[in-house]
């Protein structure tokens, strides 16, 4: 079974409760629990890493000899981060899920380390505000930082990480939708998953990477191998070209002779436009945030960032007013280099911003004059030892956008039992995307854990 882009399952669907719940779908339609697929991949990485390190010395290496760093998209939520730790544990990388031998590093943070430490150290100085635009295959992740010092390097997060599922595979999906429309459902179904299909994708990848959106640019596709899966000869290919062009504006007409199909610039650009529009809108919203202030540098990293079309869009949106867009010399390697730096220098990020509001359900005295209390009164009220009716409330410990202490410890809050005879207190830990939450309503909060004291 061949699984592609399975990492995106954790980005595309939320609300999972169990680690075994997400499913990965293979090219042939077969389904397996995502944890099985992810564990197999991480186990392979582990075995390859140990074999390589062992080959460099006369001593056989084990997992205990290695400090592991697993890079993840910045848009992964708490569930997804826990999922990756469980997968690493099942793969034998760590002995316990919470082992300190494994660190999770956000991909744009790794890139930020690489850019400020090695690729562009001359650009960063104390007070400099930078944005990392990490454009990969599946996701686009954006983090924003202020340089506090250079020796030692210390960075402060300005805004919570943001981004979305707008990687280069979205452009690939648009191209594959065109293939389906062009060839027809029957021919496309016969082609999908074959070696000829991946040969076509390789041709597309070559053209996509270099495409800059110029009016005279074209992408040429050799359909010889494709033709073998649908008895498509030169005459049939001409019919397919004519059928597609019918109803299309002239600038989107495909051309070519025999089994060659040439995609015009306007058509290729239409594959990019929705994805780049999503990225630009996110960049615009981030830069306009009043909490961020003046931006000096934007570092472009990730494989998709090498796209001339994407680079031009980022520069059009961000450059000016003292801001410069800097593309990494080796955009696909920046995250790997940064992860290696992160392994020994995780404390470089002195302050991070909370992406969610976290708190617990506690109790307050019911007030019949408060309409919010009346609205939330239950059919089976709870009373304290003094006979006072109690109602659930939300007690926040940290709010979205607030600084997370470097040691992860929030200010202490005190709670007392509703009944003096209680021997334990049960807390339900909730999170919310909103800042000001007073009550644990289901449409405003969601559960993340439980604690019994």
Model regions and ranges:
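Nucleotide/phosphate-binding catalytic cleft detector across ATP-hydrolyzing
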Residues: 3-132, 195, 199, 213-214, ...
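Early-domain small/polar-rich strand-loop-helix modules and first-structured segments
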Residues: 1-21, 97, 103, 154-155, ...
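Gly/charged contiguous loops adjacent to phosphate- or pyrophosphate-bearing nucleotide/cofactor binding elements
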Residues: 10, 33, 73-75, 166-315, ...
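Acidic low-complexity intrinsically disordered segments
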Residues: 232-274, 279, 349-453
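Phosphate/ATP-binding catalytic cores across multiple sugar-kinase/actin-like superfamilies
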Residues: 40-59, 110-121, 126, 253, ...
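Gly/Thr-rich phosphate-binding beta-strand-loop-beta motif of the actin/hexokinase/Hsp70
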Residues: 117-157, 175, 358, 370
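Conserved helicase motor "Helicase C" RecA-like lobe of SF1/SF2 P-loop NTPases
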Residues: 82-87, 305-322
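Conserved phosphate-binding/catalytic loops in two-lobed NTP-binding clefts
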Residues: 92-106, 110, 314-338
């Amino acid at each position: 079974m061949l699984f592609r882009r399975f990492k995106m399952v954790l980005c595309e669907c939320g609300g999972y409760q169990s680690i075994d719940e997400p499913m990965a779908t293979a090219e042939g339609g077969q389904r397996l629990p995502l944890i099985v697929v992810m564990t197999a991949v991480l186990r392979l990485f582990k075995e390859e890493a140990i074999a390589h390190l062992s080959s460099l010395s006369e001593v056989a290496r084990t997992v205990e000899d290695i400090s592991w760093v697993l890079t993840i998209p910045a848009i992964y939520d708490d569930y997804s981060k826990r999922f990756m730790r469980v997968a690493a544990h099942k793969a034998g990388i760590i002995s316990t899920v919470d082992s300190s031998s494994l660190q999770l590093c956000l991909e744009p943070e790794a890139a930020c380390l690489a850019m400020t430490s090695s690729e562009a150290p001359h650009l960063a100085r104390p007070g400099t505000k930078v944005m990392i635009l990490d454009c990969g295959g599946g996701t686009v992740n954006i983090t924003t930082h202020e340089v506090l010092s250079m020796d030692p390097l210390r960075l402060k997060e300005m805004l919570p990480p943001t981004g979305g599922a707008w990687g280069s595979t979205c452009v690939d999906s648009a191209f594959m939708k065109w293939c389906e429309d062009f060839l027809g459902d029957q021919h496309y179904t016969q082609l999908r998953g074959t070696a000829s299909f991946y040969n076509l994708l390789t041709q597309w990848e070559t053209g996509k990477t270099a495409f800059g959106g110029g009016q005279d640019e074209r992408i040429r596709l050799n359909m010889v191998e494709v033709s073998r899966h649908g008895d498509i000869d030169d005459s049939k290919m001409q019919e397919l070209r004519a059928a597609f062009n019918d109803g299309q504006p002239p600038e989107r007409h495909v051309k070519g002779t025999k089994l060659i199909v040439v995609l015009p610039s306007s058509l290729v650009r239409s594959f990019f436009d929705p994805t780049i529009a999503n990225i630009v809108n996110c960049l615009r919203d981030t830069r306009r945030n009043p909490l961020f202030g003046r931006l000096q540098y934007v570092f472009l990293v990730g494989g998709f960032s090498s796209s001339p079309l994407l680079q031009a869009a980022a520069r059009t949106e961000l450059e000016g007013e003292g801001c410069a867009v800097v593309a990494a010399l080796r955009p696909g390697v920046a995250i790997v280099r940064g992860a290696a730096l992160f392994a020994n220098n995780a404390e470089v990020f002195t302050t991070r911003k909370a992406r969610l509001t976290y708190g617990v359900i506690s109790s307050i005295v019911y007030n019949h004059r408060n309409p919010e209390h009346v609205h939330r009164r239950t059919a089976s009220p709870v009373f304290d030892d003094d006979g006072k009716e109690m109602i659930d409330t939300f007690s926040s410990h940290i709010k979205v956008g607030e600084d997370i202490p470097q040691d992860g410890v929030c200010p202490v809050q005190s709670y007392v039992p509703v009944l003096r005879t209680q021997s334990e207190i049960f807390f339900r830990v909730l999170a919310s995307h909103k800042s000001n939450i007073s009550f644990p309503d289901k449409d405003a909060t969601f559960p993340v854990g439980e604690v019994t004291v």
